[in-house]
Amino acid sequence: MTSRTLRAMTVLTAAAALCSAAPTAYAAHTTTATTTATAAAAASSAQAADRRVPRIVTAWARAWNGSEPRALGALFTADGTYTDEAVAATFRGRKEISGWKARADSLIGNVHVTIRTTRSDGNRITVRSVYSGHLKGAPKPFAVPMTTVIDLDRHHCRIVSNKDHYSLATVLAQSGLPADWTPPTT
């Protein structure tokens, strides 16, 4: 059992024990046992739901892993934004976002995003993944943890905002490049 499941069962068990108006210890035990079994089933179901990756996230990873920059741009609303926090760059609209993907492909060989977990909350999805590739001209490839916060439109069909968070210092260190390295401008 995970600590999350144990914590949920402990809280529900304590709540059932405190709220129980059962006249005997046996009745209280029966209520607590039933509540614990129900809580365990609910926690297990919630964990199974967390393992399902939302369709838009699968499409997002497929677009990053593919070679067609417009596939990434097409996932966004017309005025959507893509922010790469590590390089302090924001792109607006499908054309700029597609251009960012094309630039990334020209600088990084074998760009790949591997989804580890997702967490949905309303129109927001937090994606934990591994961002990997090989900066062109670098002696070694990199693979760093990345967290992406994706905000969806009200229909959950398109991305309104995407913010990637990863360590550029770690990318450069793993790649064998100096900390002040900058990509070529052409």
Each predicted region: which residue ranges?
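Soluble or luminal CAZymes and related metallo-dependent hydrolases
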Residues: 52, 96, 142
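A solvent-exposed, acidic/Ser-Thr-rich amphipathic alpha-helical stretch
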Residues: 69-121
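Short, flexible active-site loop motifs that bind/organize anionic cofactors or intermediates
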Residues: 59-62, 87, 161
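Short, low-complexity N-terminal intrinsically disordered segments enriched in polar/charged residues
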Residues: 2-6, 10-74, 180-186
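A beta-strand edge to alpha-helix "cap/lid" segment located at domain peripheries
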Residues: 12, 17, 38, 99-186
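Alpha-helix C-capping/helix-to-loop hinge sites
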Residues: 60-63, 83, 134
